[in-house]
Curated annotation (Swiss-Prot):
Tissue and organ distribution: Expressed in PHA sensory neurons and in head muscles. Expressed in chemosensory neurons AWC, ASE, ASJ, AUA, PHA and PHB, interneuron PVQ, several other unidentified head neurons, an excretory gland cell and head muscles. Highly expressed in the sensory cila at the nose tip.
Glycosylation: residue positions: 104, 113, 174, 298, 395, 516, 530
Localization (cell): Cell membrane; Cell projection, Cilium; Perikaryon; Cell projection, Dendrite
Keyword Ion transport on entry: no
Pfam families per UniProt: ANF_receptor (PF01094), Guanylate_cyc (PF00211), PK_Tyr_Ser-Thr (PF07714)
EC number: 4.6.1.2
Name used for this protein in its record: Receptor-type guanylate cyclase gcy-12
Function noted in UniProt: Guanylate cyclase involved in the production of the second messenger cGMP. Acts upstream of cGMP-dependent protein kinase egl-4, most likely by providing cGMP to the kinase in chemosensory neurons to regulate body size.
Domain description: The protein kinase domain is predicted to be catalytically inactive.
Any one Gene Ontology cellular component term annotated for this protein: perikaryon
Temperature notes for this entry: Optimum temperature is 20-25 degrees Celsius. Loses activity at temperatures above 35 degrees Celsius.
Enzyme kind, highest EC tier: lyase
Length: 1679
């Protein structure tokens, strides 16, 4: 096995410095380092073909893509076609083992050995030298060839019918070897040649002769180009060496640098000289296009004695070159020698030039470093002979000075490879793995090489070109795409491609790669302070990427410089000039001497001669002025016109065709230079001198002829026209095959468009105004120099934004000759308005005759008739009916086009054929004017002045009031109607503003939020010792991995909701939650004392730990949740971070220490630091602390920490969410689509409110401005039980006034009876229910003894209406604070007076699906009660009762249930709402089942027997309430997946509210009793647990109605099984299945009975011992 380069280096280190060998091998040190890469055999005279036996393996097997023989093989049937790639490369060679070579050389001694031995020694030494003369890194990049072939062959979408193979030939850097190998590979069947590297001219010519492609990845020969026929099949992926100088010229041009000097070394004379010659040619080329020429001031060619330019002689030569040129140049250029660049920069810095206006630009064609730190350490600034810390740590080191000098340096390099690309990483790894195919073992520290990318791109471009040819020619067996080299190269050139380097490159039409280059400048970077890091760089500035050079749209021009985030940091803030202001020698600032006597004489003579010529000149100017005006006044510079390419149309009636937002063409190619292929017509809009103008194209089939003098006079006359009813002609643009007419833009379009728009209602005012404007304009044109229009038609009558008609498209008689149209139909259509004498029809061709003034009168008559009919000329565009006895077809149809041509021909042939006026309902004088205008005798037609006099009766009204006054009156009415709509939108805006403020106050502390709302900056603030809490979930990664994302989100939401409800009890601030981490602080932003805040955090931590012990993961109910808690006390800094989604965040070591306390803690324990322990011990509040001992804390060292085990005398009950008015910050989901909410038209958000509803809105607007306002709540009892909401904008259940209580108590008995009664059709109700899709029933609980007094009179300002009630989404808590503990069991609940009529919602527009009513989301206006109907009387309302209540978060909706009791001795029950076919809500029907949702592949499904058992209640219960089957009721059932049964899951949030409303537990039915469980449950047990919660005060908090398992009682957690309703059944099917079940309400008290049994259900028994409170009365609903 050949040794790797690292092994060779290690061997050399041991070998070279052994005694007796140092002198011999010192000069060969670098030889042996590179020789580690020389591994294969190569004879200088002959190169044998690769042997399949000697070929290294590809992974575990042989290389399947290396050709096994140079003999062609016939493909087998079914095999893929093989494409053989010839790979020619000069790989370094060395015969034998590298270590054996070194040993043999060491053992040789020229003084002791014979001449033959010395000759052998010399031969071996020459072989190593020959190895180094070739490119050593070629063998390193050759693996990219195999990587590309493997990837292409494995790509099923790229040339799937072909397989690539390659044959390799080692040219050894010899041209004759390369030519011979080329011929051998061609004879073996090679279809494409990749390579060779240096000289490829011969190979390119040979490939072109065989029409085979050759793609080079290294050849830089400037003489090879596809422009030459001999190299037509040549392309290369490596940019020519001189391509980078285009970027240099672009940089010079960017900063207006025109003069520069060049310094370069001639060590590699031919290469550097060729680069310089390329630069000279580029300067000469650019000077052809530049007014200010580029100039190379000096050229210094230096030759150095040492490669590292370390000798004093070399340094002196550079210094002399700078001193000799510094007086004539400011900009220096050097290239391809970084040592020269570094030395020049150092010398210029020592001479002080870098602090002046001097710049050094370095161009590096071979830059190949990975990042800025590598390039600083190894390439640009550091002396690589010294150690890193010697370079950068010493302030006076040469390397530190170099960094200061670099402010006056720039560098242009090939854009570095994007190493962060996963694609490149995979490619380079594969290329390294395949190196052994070419005799190289890849070293671990071998860095990437750009040549490998060029080699990969070459193979991939070839494969893509073959793929395009295969797709183009399909299955044509007669065509072999691999043999058509020119076609392959044609599909490679002139295209951009994505290089493996990570950016776009392009191969131009000459076959040369354009390259991609970047600019480096002195920039600020992040330092690397770790000295053990190979990239150690402790400085904060370096030469870093600043800009890239982007290819210009004109590909032959210089690239554009495109900067990144930062600009060049100039030394003086601006780029230095390339020469001083006064020149290098002050030649630009020399004082002018006194005029000589001769100069004075000459000036006098010139003045006299000027006076003599003045007379002649003035006369000549007068004569030429007219000619100049004649030829220029109509001409428009096309560069001043910017075409509008897009816009957002404003479709309001005030602006029918105007674009509110316009986009202009941004391309640098002039729009007018692209000759369109369409015919004559409107081009569109444009901007001309900041004004919108209209464009119209006149297209020609040839170049337009030059304008005659008469045509120019006509254009001048048109340009001088100025009249309100004549469209301003601005000029024309003469293009290659067209003439573009530029005119004033009219936003309303043409009269033809207005008349065709059926949505516009044109009254007499509009018609008279249009006709008057048209006549006035024609009178003005006929009186002008034009004398006639010549092309009058309704499409040329334009309407301005002020509804004024302007005549356009007049004149241009000569320009209209020979114009082209899109189709013949457009020609015939233009003649519809033309007089018969003004046209000639010859066969299928219609030609215009010279126009006359009388022809304009004819055209006016046709337009006049068109205005009144609005059906086009001759009623061509009428949609129905008959036109002149024939059925009129639809516009733009084939029949209509034929009818147009037929009509024009009939007008031309029949002098009496005119439009029919018999059905026009107009005055006789109008018809007389029409007939006179289109008289068959042109001389009998009236002039326009006569027409104006005859139409005076038509214009009588517009003389009193113009059209704009008429429109103003219409707009005033429209504005009045819009005021009500604005009021409504203002209310919504204020509501959304309130939501936004509440949202900000929930995201940030109130004090910080107030500062932000006030527009103030939040200044970071340092706090004295505060206490910080951290916690996270133990095993969260495992839980996340075994759960779905939705389950994880639901779990975290529930857990953090529990935490949030706890922390509200303490003076703390929740900082943030990141994943499973929870961070809380006390003392920020309001600081009190250190002891107080530590106590608050400690109590909160104990409380949270207590709550977590009783918490279960929703989807893993049998698995306990464990968390770690950490606490620490110390100072910190807090402030708002960021502008987008600002966060109030803590900073400091205290945060880190608190996090360490948590991460080093244990599950279900509180870990605190010694600082927190000291504070808690000092306050002596009974905290139980236990010393844990000394612990090694990361980043802190040894720390003594403590366990906080609790607080003496404190126990925490199950946590229920706090009672709190949560601001309604979340907008309703249908807010934008719901339309108006005040009884206006629901179908459009732009429709206007009615007069009645507008009064309500105005009162509401006034009420919204008041604070702390009581609001009226309206509800209505239903005959079948429950209450129907009559609407309110508040969010809380009602509370009663004292005056209302007695009236309600007297009639409470009717409430329970009404629940079981049948539903009666309400005939007294005038209105529907307030919200048909969101109705709810509720129980009005008895308020506390202290009640507010209801106002004696009704105040209009207290009215507020809402459109919808909003249901509770999943996971949201219902506020049940209105249930009072003392009143629930002891006090009576008032009922609604039974003399109030029921307002059963009237069923409207809905579809019934399985017993559900699907209502329209926008209610009709009749659903809202009248304002007067709701204000009749203080006690008994006309349609309901009014109660005042405070704001709550959400209103109850369908499925909510609350226990109620009529009196102390009466029966009790519950009111529960559900969906009904006749309304949105009604009393719960126990036989109803909810429709199941559609299934998904991952949902849990249960067996059919489980379904039946869960639904059939009677089959599950025994006489004592126990379960019959243990198999059906399980604590944690294992789901079984099945696809034929319904899914047991909630079909909607409504089902959860049905289930959650039950007092017997959320997830477990009240009959559930699992004998295998330790704890059993009965109906009374569930009731007992519910009332124990009420007694414990939990009713004053938010009830958690979404807990997964059942409630936890005193003896532990009761297991439960989730009962879910399902199925899609109609009401009849449910009755057949469930029999005659009815909603039964039973009640009992311990004083009346020991065991209560419902007579209708003998299976239900309730033991009296399970009642928790003797004073409590049980309320139960059975289904």
């Amino acid at each position: 096995m050949w040794p790797t380069s690292v092994e060779a280096l290690r061997f050399y280190h041991t070998f070279a410095f052994s005694p007796g060998r140092r002198r011999r091998l010192f000069g060969l040190s670098i030889v042996f380092v590179i020789a580690a890469l020389c591994v294969t055999s190569c004879d200088a005279d002959a190169v044998p073909a690769p042997s399949p036996e000697a070929e290294p393996s590809l992974g575990a097997g042989a290389n399947p893509y290396l050709l096994d023989s140079l003999v062609k093989r016939l493909p087998k049937k079914g095999d893929k076609k093989e494409i053989l790639i010839s790979y020619l490369a000069a790989v370094p060679t060395l015969m034998g083992e590298i270590d054996q070579y070194l040993l043999n050389l060491s053992a040789s001694n020229s003084a002791q050995n014979s001449s033959k031995d010395r000759e052998s020694f010399s031969k071996k030494l020459n072989q190593i030298v020959h190895c180094l003369t070739t490119d050593a890194y070629v063998s390193v990049v050759s693996g990219a060839l195999v990587a590309a072939i493997v990837e292409i062959n494995q790509d099923k979408d790229l040339i799937p019918a072909y397989q690539l193979k390659y044959v390799f030939g080692n040219t050894c850097g010899n041209d004759s070897h390369s030519t011979r190998l080329f011929m051998e590979h061609w004879q073996a069947g090679a279809r494409v040649f990749i390579g060779p590297e240096k000289n490829c001219k011969t190979e390119a010519a040979m490939a072109a002769s065989q029409n085979l492609p050759i793609i080079s990845y290294r050849c830089n020969d400037q003489d090879i180009s596809r422009d030459d026929y001999h190299y037509r099949t040549f392309a290369r992926t490596v940019p020519p060496a001189g391509e980078i100088f285009k970027a240099f010229m672009s940089l010079m041009k960017q900063y207006n640098w025109r003069k520069f000097s060049v310094v370069y070394d001639v060590k590699k004379g031919q290469v550097k000289n060729e680069l310089f010659e390329t630069l000279k040619r580029m300067v000469e080329t650019e000077n052809k296009f530049e007014e200010h020429k580029f100039e190379i001031m000096n050229v210094s060619k230096l030759e150095f004695s040492k490669m590292d330019i370390s000798s004093q002689q070399d340094i002196q030569s550079i210094e002399n070159a700078i001193k000799s040129t510094m007086q004539t140049t400011r900009i220096y250029l050097t290239f391809d020698n970084v040592r020269l660049f570094r030395t020049m920069l150092s010398i210029m810095g020592e001479m002080g030039l870098t602090q002046q206006d001097y710049m050094l630009i370095y161009v590096d064609t071979n830059y190949d470093w990975l990042n800025v730190y590598h390039s600083m350490n190894n390439h640009f600034l550091r002396n690589t002979m010294t150690y890193l810390h010697h370079s950068w740590d010493a302030n006076n080191s040469s390397d530190r000075k170099m960094l200061d000098y670099a402010r006056s340096a720039l560098s242009i390099i090939p854009t570095p490879v994007k190493l962060n690309s996963q694609r490149f990483y995979n490619f380079w790894k594969k290329a390294g793995d395949y190196m052994h195919h070419f005799g190289v073992q890849k070293a671990d520290n071998l860095k990437g090489n750009r040549i490998a990318c060029y080699l990969y791109d070459a193979v991939y471009l070839y494969a893509k070109a073959i793929h395009e040819l295969v797709e183009e020619y399909g299955n044509d067996d007669s065509y072999d795409p691999t043999a058509d080299g020119k076609a392959i190269i044609d599909r490679i050139v002139n295209k951009k491609y994505r290089s493996i380097q990570g950016f776009d490159m392009r191969i131009d039409e000459r076959g040369n790669s354009k390259g991609n280059f970047s600019l480096l400048s002195w920039q600020k970077v992040a330092p690397i302070m770790n000295k053990s890091d190979p990239s150690y760089y402790p400085l904060d500035h370096a030469l870093d990427l600043t800009a890239i050079f982007v290819e210009a749209p004109d590909k032959d021009r210089l690239p554009n410089l495109q900067f990144k985030s930062s600009r060049i940091q100039w030394l003086k803030g601006e780029p230095p000039p390339d020469e001083p202001v006064c020149g290098f020698h002050g030649e630009n600032c020399r004082k002018k001497g006194i005029f000589s006597y001769l100069t004075v004489v000459v000036m006098i003579l010139i003045a006299v001669f000027s006076l003599v010529l003045t007379g002649f000149t003035l006369n000549y100017i007068r004569s030429r002025r007219f000619e100049k005006e004649l030829s220029m006044i109509w001409k428009i510079d096309p560069y001043e016109v910017r075409r509008v390419v897009g816009g957002v149309n404003n479709e309001s009636t005030a602006s029918l065709m105007q674009s509110d937002v316009m986009q202009f063409a941004k391309t640098k190619t002039p729009w007018w230079s692209k000759a369109p292929v369409q015919g004559t017509g409107m081009r569109g809009l444009a901007s001309y001198k900041g004004t919108l103008v209209g464009l119209k194209d006149l297209m020609y089939g040839r170049k337009p002829k030059d304008l005659t003098r008469e045509a120019k006079k006509e254009l001048r006359a048109m340009r001088q026209l100025a009249h309100p009813n004549v469209n301003n002609f601005l000029g024309i643009i003469v293009c290659q095959y067209s003439v573009t007419v530029v005119r004033e833009y009219c936003s309303k379009g043409s009269l033809h468009d207005i008349l065709r728009n059926e949505n516009l209602k044109l009254d007499h005012m509009y018609v008279a105004s249009f006709v008057d404007d048209l006549v006035k304009g024609m009178v003005y044109i006929h009186d002008s120099e034009l004398k006639m229009h010549g092309n009058l038609k309704s499409t040329n009558c334009l309407i301005t934004s002020r509804w004024t008609l302007q005549i356009a498209d007049f004149g241009l008689r000569e320009l209209r000759e020979g114009i082209m149209y899109d189709s013949s139909y457009n020609i015939w259509e233009n003649f519809l308005w033309t007089a018969p004498e003004a046209m000639t029809i010859n066969g299928s061709l219609a030609i215009s005759n010279p126009p006359t003034p009388k022809a304009d009168a004819y055209s006016f008559g046709i337009i006049f008739h068109e205005i009144f009919t609005r059906e086009g000329p001759y009623k061509i565009y009428v949609q129905r009916g008959d036109v002149n006895g024939e059925a009129a077809p639809k516009k733009d149809s084939v029949e209509c086009r034929a009818l147009v041509e037929k009509t024009v021909r009939r007008v031309y042939s029949d002098p009496y054929f005119r439009p029919d006026t018999s059905d026009l309902e107009v005055q006789n004088y109008v018809k007389e004017v029409m007939a006179a205008c289109w008289h068959h005798d042109p001389y009998q037609r009236p002039e326009f002045k006569t027409i104006k006099n005859k139409l005076k009766p038509l214009f009588h009204q517009i003389y009193k009031q113009n059209i704009m006054d008429h429109m103003v009156l219409m707009m005033e009415k429209y504005q009045t109607q819009l005021e009500d709509l604005v009021d409504e939108r203002t209310i919504e805006l204020k509501d959304e503003q309130r939501r936004s403020q509440h949202l900000l106050q929930r995201m940030l502390p109130s004090s910080v939020a107030e500062q932000l709302l006030a527009g103030q900056d939040v200044i970071p603030e340092a706090f004295p010792p505060v206490t910080i809490y951290f916690s996270d979930i133990v095993g969260f990664t495992t839980i996340s991995g075994e759960s779905t994302p939705m389950e994880v989100v639901t779990f975290l939401n529930k857990l953090y909701t529990l935490f949030d409800s706890i922390i509200r009890r303490y003076d703390v601030y929740k900082v943030e939650t990141i994943g499973d981490a929870y961070m809380v602080v006390s003392g920020v932003p309001q600081y009190k004392t250190m002891e107080y805040h530590a106590e608050q955090i400690a109590m909160m931590a104990i409380h949270i730990l207590s709550a977590v012990r009783s918490f279960s993961i929703p989807h893993r109910s049998c698995e306990p949740l464990m968390i770690r808690i950490g606490m620490h006390t110390g100072p910190c800094v807090a402030g708002v971070v960021g502008k987008t989604m600002p966060r109030y965040t803590l900073f400091g070591d205290t945060v880190n220490t608190a996090s360490r306390m948590e991460s080093n803690g244990e599950a279900l324990r509180i870990h605190c630091s010694s600082s927190t322990q000291k504070v808690l011990t000092s306050i002596d509040q009974g905290f139980l602390l236990e010393e844990r001992g000394s612990l090694a804390i990361k980043g802190k060292g040894q720390m003594t920490t403590y366990w906080l085990n609790g607080r003496a005398g404190y126990e925490f009950t199950e946590t229920i969410e706090d009672k709190m008015v949560v601001p309604d910050i979340f907008p309703r989901p249908n807010l934008k689509n719901r339309g108006s909410s005040w009884g206006v038209n629901r179908e459009s958000s732009l429709s206007l409110a009615t007069e009645k509803s507008s009064q309500i809105m105005k009162r509401q607007s006034a009420a919204m401005n008041r604070n702390n306002q009581d609001v009226i709540y309206y509800n209505q009892p239903l005959n079948s039980g429950g209450f129907t909401s009559r609407g309110t904008s508040n969010r809380e259940m009602p509370k009663l006034y004292e005056e209302d209580r007695e009236s309600l108590l007297n009639q409470s008995a009717s409430l329970l009876g009404s629940r079981t009664s049948g539903r009666k059709k309400s005939t007294a109700s005038k209105y529907n229910g307030f919200s048909a899709s969101r109705m709810f029933s509720s129980t009005i609980s008895n308020a506390s003894s202290s009640r507010p007094s209801r106002p004696s009179t009704f105040d209009h300002d207290t009215l507020a209406l809402r459109k919808r009630s909003t249901s509770l989404p999943d996971g949201e808590k219902l506020n049940l604070e209105f249930i009072e503990t003392t009143n629930l069991a002891n006090n009576s609940v008032p009922a609604i007076p039974n003399n109030i009529s029921s307002l059963e919602p009237v069923f409207r527009k809905a579809s019934i699906i399985d017993g559900y009513s699907s209502q329209s989301e926008s209610p009709s206006q009749s659903q809202y009660p009248s304002y007067r109907d709701l204000t009749t009387g203080p006690h008994q309302r006309k349609r309901g009762i009014a109660t005042v209540f405070p704001v709550r978060k959400r209103s109850l909706s369908c499925g909510d249930a609350v226990p109620l009791k009529i009196n102390e001795n009466g029966a009790s029950g519950s009111i529960t709402t559900a969906v009904s076919p006749r309304s949105s809500c009604r009393a719960l029907d126990p036989t109803m089942k909810l429709a199941a949702r559609a299934s998904s592949p991952d949902e849990i499904i249960f067996q059919e027997d489980d379904e039946d058992a869960l639904i059939d209640n009677d089959s599950l219960l025994t006489s004592n309430g126990n379960s019959k089957s243990e198999d059906v009721l399980r604590t944690c059932p294992q789901p079984r997946r099945k696809n034929k049964h319904s899914f047991l899951r909630d079909p909607s949030p409504l089902a959860k509210r049905f289930r959650d409303a039950s007092p017997f537990g959320k997830k477990k039915p009240f009959w559930n009793s699992n004998k295998s469980n330790e704890h059993t449950s009965s109906p009374a047990d569930s009731i007992s647990r519910l009332f124990r919660r009420f007694r414990g005060g939990s009713v004053n908090e938010y009830a958690d109605l979404n807990h997964y398992c059942d409630d936890e009682d005193e003896s532990g957690r009761a297991n439960g099984y989730e009962m879910q309703e399902m199925g899609k059944m109609t009401g009849r099917q449910r009755e057949q299945r469930n029999g005659s079940r009815t909603n039964r309400s039973v009640s009992c008290s311990p004083d009346e009975c020991g065991t209560l049994t419902d007579s209708s259900d003998p299976h239900l028994t309730i033991p009296s011992s399970s009642i928790g409170d003797s004073s409590a009365s049980t309320s139960l609903s059975c289904s």
